[in-house]
Each structure stands twice: as C-alpha cells, then as structure tokens.
Swiss-Prot record:
The active site is at 314 (proton acceptor). It comes from Shewanella oneidensis (strain ATCC 700550 / JCM 31522 / CIP 106686 / LMG 19005 / NCIMB 14063 / MR-1). Its EC number is 2.5.1.19. One of its GO terms (cellular component) is cytoplasm. Catalyzes the transfer of the enolpyruvyl moiety of phosphoenolpyruvate (PEP) to the 5-hydroxyl of shikimate-3-phosphate (S3P) to produce enolpyruvyl shikimate-3-phosphate and inorganic phosphate. The keyword Cytoplasm applies. GO terms for biological process: amino acid biosynthetic process; aromatic amino acid family biosynthetic process; chorismate biosynthetic process. This is 3-phosphoshikimate 1-carboxyvinyltransferase. NCBIfam families: aroA.
Length: 426
C-alpha cells in the first residue's frame, strides 16, 4: 500500500485555482446529453467519477470531444432520451453522482440497462429513488439486495403524475428525479417526505435545469411542479464552477496556519452551498474575505463551534479535522448522511481522530471532538474515500506531522490534491 508522509508545516501562504465541481460536472454532462444542440463545458473536473459518467455516455452512443487535459468537453446532445437496441451493462465505480442520475435518466428511453459498480456501491442505498421511479411506471429489478445496486432497468418511458420521494437520506435521489421529470409523458408533481437534507445541492440542480431552459416550480422544498411538454435546450456554453468542497481544505489551511490562502474559481456568486463552509471558519475565528469568484482565509486563533451542518455535509468533514486546532469541544450535528457516502464517514472519522489523540463522541447523526493537549502522529486509513485523505492532510499543521495511507484515493475528485497542498508551504 502506498503511503504519503506529511512533515510538519509551520505556515502556509498562496493561491489555488480550484478544479471543477464534481456535482456540477456530472449534472451538466447529463443535461447536455438530454438537450437539443451542442454544449461546450469548460473547467470540467478530470477525475474518476467524471470518467465513469463519460464512459457510460459514450457506451450509450453520446458523441463528445475532450481537450488534451480533459477539462473542456464539446458534447452533441441527443435532443431527448437515451435508448439502445442492445442490452447494455454500465460500470459506474463508486460514483453516486453518476449512478443515481443515470438510473433515473435511463428509464425515459427504450432498452435494457444494467448498472453496476465497485463493492462499496452495492452498500450505498438507491431504494428511495427506485421507489419513486416505480410510482411513475418504471420497471427496475434489483440483482442482489433490495434497495441497492446492481440493478436492471427495462425502460419504456416514464409516466407523469404525482410521486412521493423520501428527502431525509440523500438529496441525490431528488436531484435525479427532478432532472428526468421534464421528459416524462406528462406533468410531474414531486412531494418530498420528511425533512430534505442538503438543500443547497437541490439549488445547484434547479439552477442548471434553468440554464438548459426548463421550468420547475419549487414550493418551499416540500413540493416541486414540473410542467409537461418541456425540452432541454443547450445554452451553448457551460462554465463549471470550482468545487466548493475541495476549496474547504485550502481555506481551513489558511485559517489554521495562515498566512493567507486565496482560492479562486468559487466565491460569493457561487451556486454551491458548500461555500458556506467559509462562514463556519469565520464563526471559529478565522479572517475571511469574499470576492465574486474568490475567497481568502487568514489565520487566527480558532474556537470550537456547535452547529447543524446538514446543509454542507461534505465540507463539514473538514471542520472535523480543523476542530483539532480549535479551543474547546466542537460538535457537528445533523450529518446522518455521512454514513451512506463513499464509506461510513461518521465511523471512519471517529476512528481516525482518536488515533491522533482526540476525545471523540460518535452519535447516530453527530460527532463531538475535543482536541488533546498535544496531537500524536499516526498512520491515517482513508477507506478508499477521497475526503478522508484530504481532511486529514490538515494534520500536517501539527508539530508531529502525519502519514496518509492510500493517498491516491483523491483521484475520485482531486487527483493532484497533494501537489497543490504542498505548494502552499512557506
């Protein structure tokens, strides 16, 4: 197993241009596929999750051209649904942002489609989405365990009508349903059961759908109306914002050991909720400066916070390791959906924080973190989870440094993360 030793860093300073957002990249690729016309996507993320989506689209007959560095994609839209005369099997790795939307989109056309992935994907729930699609007439069969991939879709199109979907586990289910609803055979009314998690991710979806010319009526996130007879139309060009979750590591670095760290590609005009991570750092005591397309974090003594972070679940992980450098006990609440991500992130985070000496209380949907007087060095297991590796890079700011096991797992969203991270050292 590959290991990366991060020696203690005294201070950081610099500027990082953040790679494209995973959430926006895969949503935009799918909408461009369903749209009339050719779309040029710029600042597309070049990572495993995007490659799985692109490979699947190519297998389904979608034509596109990538630039030499894979960050510009010119894609010819199908002007409607994806169909296939031959049965197709699509391998989607551990990419939830490809599995969930494709599962929904493939019900719109004609054909037999089997969706598979890595072993961890078989543990990541999809039942709430499948239940909703079945209410609209979809024929979907589980191949192993009910509620989980792999699965086969026997597609004949999707009916309109009223549909209920559970909202308190993952916003990706609602995102997938929203994106396919305009191409159903009639108007769709989506009723959300329970409290909707990660609302800002739904805002991303709605903003992109509007960019492609589709109207959705949002009734306070409890009900969504999607009128019939709509079509996606390419806006011509789509600029993929920098990934706000990826920005969180560099902003935290500035807050803990700045100096001054500036991230570009994301700022106050962002459609991503994870930019609110900077507000949490500010509550902890960091000096934050906002521009339209940049954020600057400057170091200051940090103090613990006790906050509901349901709206920024991915970026909230960075607060868990930043808490090791804050005075007092930090509590991160309402984060049950950490448990259904690339790994059970609540359990993994608690385990690894304890290795460096933190006192940790792991609840069903919260985590309490009290830093030790002196942090220990340790070998951090990353659970094939890109965010675990990036979060624990913050331990380079301890006097003892840290060793990251399997650092290449960052290829899921940020292949050269550790190169960029090293560039901040003073």
């Amino acid at each position: 197993m590959k290991q990366l030793r991060l020696e203690p860093v005294v201070q950081v300073r610099g500027e990082i241009n953040i790679p494209g957002s995973k959430s926006i990249s895969n949503r935009a690729l799918l909408l461009a596929t369903l749209a009339q016309g050719t779309t040029t996507l710029t600042n597309l993320l070049d990572s495993d999750d995007i490659r799985h989506m692109l490979a699947s689209l190519k297998q389904l007959g979608v034509e596109y051209r990538l630039s030499h560095n894979n960050t510009v994609c010119e894609l010819a839209g199908l002007g409607g649904v994806m169909s296939s005369k031959q049965a197709q099997t699509l391998f989607l790795g551990n990419a939830g942002t490809a599995m969930r939307p494709l599962c929904a989109a493939l019900t719109l056309g004609q054909g037999e489609f089997t969706l598979t992935g890595e072993p961890r994907m078989e543990e990541r729930p999809i039942g709430d989405l499948v239940d909703a699609l079945r209410q609209l007439g979809a024929n979907i069969v589980y191949l192993k365990n009910d509620g989980f991939p792999p699965l086969t879709i026997n597609a004949t199109g999707l009916n309109g009508g009223d549909v209920e979907i559970v909202g308190d586990l993952s916003s990706q289910f609602l995102t997938a349903l929203l994106m396919v609803a305009p191409l159903a055979k009639g108007s769709v009314n989506i009723h959300v059961k329970g409290e909707l998690v990660s609302k800002p991710y739904i805002d991303i979806t709605l903003a992109l759908m509007a960019q492609f010319g589709v109207k959705v009526i949002n009734h306070h996130y409890a009900r969504f109306e999607i009128p019939a007879g709509q079509h996606y139309v390419s806006p011509g060009k789509v600029l993929v914002e920098g990934d706000a979750s990826s920005a969180s590591y560099f902003l935290a670095a500035g807050a803990i050991k700045g100096g001054e760290v500036k991230v570009t590609g994301v700022g106050r005009l962002s459609i991503q909720g994870d930019v609110k991570f900077a507000d949490v750092l500010e509550k902890m005591g960091a000096d934050i400066e906002w521009g339209d397309d940049y954020i600057i974090a400057r170091g200051a003594p940090l103090t613990a916070v006790d906050l509901d972070m349901n709206h920024i679940p991915d970026a909230a992980m960075t607060i868990a390791t930043a808490a090791l450098f804050a005075k007092g006990t930090t509590v991160i609440r309402n984060i049950y959906n950490w448990r259904i991500k690339e790994t059970d992130r609540l359990a993994a985070m608690a385990t690894e924080l304890r290795k460096v000496g933190a006192e940790v209380e792991e609840g069903n949907d919260y985590i309490k973190i009290t830093p030790p007087a002196v942090l220990n060095t340790a070998q951090i297991d990353t659970y094939n989870d890109h965010r675990m590796a990036m979060c624990f890079s913050m331990l380079a700011f301890a006097d003892c440094g840290i060793t990251i096991n399997d650092p290449d797992c960052t290829s899921k969203t940020f292949p050269d993360y550790f190169v960029q991270f090293a560039s901040l050292k003073v």
